[in-house]
């Protein structure tokens, strides 16, 4: 059995963090027992809420008292533009290309209004349109203030959440995605830096 892995060069930060995507709740008990952190990405709001709560509750069963969202990453699609309508128009081809591949395999992590995941007994199976993705809050679309507002909602609901992952929509040219990241850094990230600075000052 494999016990040790040597990495060259040696990681700067140790112990090395392990992150694993959470596709269903079945892997969560194993993850919390072994200190593996979770990535909950491209999920509807209700699925995300269920996964985050399950992760916290499973950790509590073994004596790990985590704040809601702690040791987790929230991931969503991103397209910044001057309006939501412009963002949707520009990202739609890439969004649709993504679900042409994912949807036939059942990789649509949305729920109905009762919290039932699509495709489970009693729940309807919808069409994963971009409009539905926006309604499910799996996408950050529009001007910076819209994106900041949604991230503030996540911050309020999940006080332990410190990591956000931005999804590079399949098929989007690399230069276009780099422009999106630059715009995110320029227009969105400054809204969150003062709080980080205040926390650092309080801890010193």
Predicted ranges, named:
Residues 1-7, 46-160, 193-204:
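An alpha-helical appendage that flanks or caps ligand/catalytic pockets
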Residues 18-21, 36-41, 70-76, 162-166:
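Hydrophobic faces of well-ordered beta-strands that scaffold small-molecule active sites
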Residues 42-43, 165-177:
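Glycine-rich, proline-tolerant flexible connector loops at the mouths of alpha/beta enzymes
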Residues 1-34, 49, 53, 62:
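Internal, glycine-rich beta/alpha segment that forms the wall or movable "lid"
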Residues 24, 44, 78-80, 170:
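Active-site-proximal loop/turn and secondary-structure-junction residues that shape catalytic pockets
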Residues 36-37, 134-137, 165-171:
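Glycine- and acidic
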Residues 18, 31, 55, 87, ...:
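Conserved, mostly hydrophobic/aromatic
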Residues 80-85, 173-183:
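Short glycine/threonine-rich loop-to-helix capping motif typified by GTGT followed
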């Amino acid at each position: 059995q494999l016990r040790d892995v040597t990495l060259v060069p040696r990681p700067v930060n140790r112990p090395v963090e392990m992150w694993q995507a959470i596709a269903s709740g079945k892997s969560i008990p194993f993850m919390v027992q072994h200190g593996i952190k979770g990535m909950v990405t491209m999920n509807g709001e209700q699925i995300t809420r269920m996964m985050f709560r399950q992760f916290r509750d499973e950790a509590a069963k073994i004596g790990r008292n985590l704040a809601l969202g702690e040791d987790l990453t929230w991931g969503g699609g991103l397209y910044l533009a001057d309006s939501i309508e412009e963002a949707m128009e520009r990202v739609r081809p890439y969004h649709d290309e993504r679900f042409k591949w994912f949807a036939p395999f059942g990789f649509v992590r949305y729920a109905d209004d009762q919290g039932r995941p699509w495709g489970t007994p009693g729940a309807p199976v919808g069409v994963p349109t971009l409009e539905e993705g926006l309604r499910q809050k799996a996408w950050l679309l529009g001007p910076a203030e819209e994106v900041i507002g949604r991230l503030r909602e996540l911050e309020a609901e999940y006080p332990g959440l410190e990591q956000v992952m931005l999804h590079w929509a399949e098929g989007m040219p690399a230069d276009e995605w780099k422009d999106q990241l630059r715009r995110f850094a320029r227009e969105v990230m400054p809204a969150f830096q003062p709080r980080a600075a205040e926390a650092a000052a309080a801890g010193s």
